[in-house]
Amino acid sequence: MEKAELLTRGVMDKYAQVRLSTVPLNSAGVGRYLPIADLVVNTTSVGMGGSGFDWLDISALQKGGKVYDMVYSPPLTPLLVKAKSSGHPYANGIGMLVAQGEEAFSLWTGEQPPPGVMKTRLRALLDK
C-alpha cells in the first residue's frame, strides 16, 4: 500500500488537476469511493485466475463510471463481467499491452510496426 500511495502522490504532484485515491483492496476501501468515482482501475493480478472481486458491488459505481482492468488474460475478468452486467463501460489491458509492444518495437528498430499486426498476433496467442 505504501508504494501505491507514493505513486499516487507523485502523479498528483505533477498534475495538480488530477485527484487520485489509493484504497485497500476490500469492500470497505473500494466501496466507499464507488458512488463518486469516475474510473475504477485494477492494477493487481486479482482476476487472472478467473476469480476475484466477489465482494465488490460494482453497481454502486456512479452512472457513467468506467472500469479498466489491466489484466489481459482472461480478456473478460470477473471485474469486467461485473462492469458489463451493470452497464458500465469497461476495457481490459490488451490495448495497453499492444501500445507498449508497438512503442518498444519502434525504440528497438527505429521503425513503426505495421498497423494492427501486434494486436492481431497477441489475440491469436491469447486464444490458444
Task: Kindly label every feature range from the protein language model.
Residues 17-90:
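Rossmann-like adenosine-cofactor binding region
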Residues 1-16:
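NAD(P)-binding Rossmann-fold cofactor-contacting core
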Residues 3-7, 53, 100-103:
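Short, charged, surface-exposed secondary-structure boundary motifs
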Residues 10-14, 38, 108-111:
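Short, hinge-like loop/turn segments at secondary-structure boundaries
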